[in-house]
Amino acid sequence: MDTIYALASARGKAGVAVLRLSGPRSHEAVQAFGVPLPSLRHAALRRLTWNGEVLDEALVLLFGAGASFTGETSAELHLHGSPAAVSSVLRVLSGLPGLRAAEAGEFTRRALENGRLDLAQVEGLADLIDAETEAQRRQAMRVFSGAIGERAERWRADLIRAAALLEATIDFADEDVPVDVTPEVLTLIDGLLADLRREVDGSRIAERIRDGFEVAIVGAPNAGKSTLLNALARREAAITSEIAGTTRDVIEVRMDLDGLPVTFLDTAGLRDTSDLVESLGIERAVTRAKAADLRVFLLDDSGPLSGITVQADDLVVQGKADLRPGQGLRLSGRTGEGVPELVAAIGERLLGRTAGAGSLTRERHRLAIERAIGAMESVRAELLRGQQHTELAADDLRRAIRSLDSLVGRVDVESLLGEIFASFCIGK
């Protein structure tokens, strides 16, 4: 097996740069710089030299096989964050026999192949690297720490127990077996179905935390939607004008709202129009607004809006409060009046939804669980039809186990790895 190396920290000037090596020759490669090797898992300051020239001073860390991120013999060099110093060390490593530069995500791939991580943990690590908000960080850390794998192992153990009971019934079908295992198997299946359905119910919110919530600003033309978006973004994200119908496409602004990733959508003003381009913009606005997690209806004096109705959690506010006195939730994007209250109300509604978030953060996770649920529902139906259907029930149990195995990467993993590791940096 090749020994791989890569810069694990960001490129460019920095206080420290971290080079990572993994593979059978990683310790030998460090020794090539003319330094005595420190004890495993103990940092030591060493002067790296090559052909009699000092390249840099570095903290050197060595890890043994089975006790590193990848599960292989590994090493880290903590250099000064000088691009020139980093390049000089990389140049030496590139010329050593048995070493090559790592591909994107290759360190993590080796951790997966060596059983240090399961597939769900790999996805959690990718989400942790991409996390922009506190809620995303917490959720990704939970998955990376093995929350999905731990649950999958418990579910799998119960399924294997149920399968063993059924297989015993099949094996001794021609003998006088006094015990009917159907009640025990049904108890196991019913408990599992309840757990898995709860996970699926919470997966939609978990996926929204990962991908971000969408909040659509809806109203008539010239109601102040773009001005409100600019006030929320604290910059000129959208063009504002006294001319009605200025916004014709959906403008998106992503924000961190109380630790949640939220994309605000400034949509075209809703009205009847003969302008083809504007009508297309209105059609798109209605589609995006209906699909959004929450809508803010910005009212003016133009009357009710057509094409979309207010849902239970939506916010209805009176716009242009600086020009129109009134009661209730009122705001002005121009002066900022009411904007903090609106942000607080949006945050309260979205945070309330996250309380039910589960551990399944990706569509792949949810689909695997839904397949397992479908298989277990078939098991239940077959058992209730009588013991003559035990073999069919056993086949469905095996199908449920395979679905859970795909969740953590025991089966059907290779086709997913390219997509997952494409988002990783070289040093990860």
UniProtKB/Swiss-Prot annotation:
EC number(s) reported in the record: 3.6.-.-
Enzyme class: hydrolase
Swiss-Prot/TrEMBL cofactor(s): K(+)
A biological-process GO annotation: tRNA methylation
SUPFAM superfamilies: P-loop containing nucleoside triphosphate hydrolases, TrmE connector domain
Binding residue positions for Mg(2+): S226, T247
Subcellular location: Cytoplasm
GO molecular function (one): metal ion binding
Location of the TrmE-type G domain: 212-351
Protein residues bound to (6S)-5-formyl-5,6,7,8-tetrahydrofolate: R20, E76, R116, K428
Disulfide bond sites: none
Sequence positions that bind GTP: 222-227, 241-247, 266-269
Keywords, alphabetical: Cytoplasm, GTP-binding, Hydrolase, Magnesium, Metal-binding, Nucleotide-binding, Potassium, tRNA processing
Pfam families noted in UniProt: MMR_HSR1, MnmE_helical, TrmE_N
Family annotation (InterPro entries): G_TrmE (IPR031168), GTP-bd (IPR006073), GTP-bd_TrmE_N (IPR018948), GTPase_MnmE (IPR004520), MnmE_dom2 (IPR027368), MnmE_helical (IPR025867), P-loop_NTPase (IPR027417), Small_GTP-bd (IPR005225)
Binding site for K(+): N222, S241, I243, T246
Family classification: Belongs to the TRAFAC class TrmE-Era-EngA-EngB-Septin-like GTPase superfamily. TrmE GTPase family.
HAMAP family named among the record's database cross-references: GTPase_MnmE (MF_00379)
Database matches in PANTHER family: TRNA MODIFICATION GTPASE GTPBP3, TRNA MODIFICATION GTPASE GTPBP3, MITOCHONDRIAL
Name the UniProt record assigns to this protein: tRNA modification GTPase MnmE
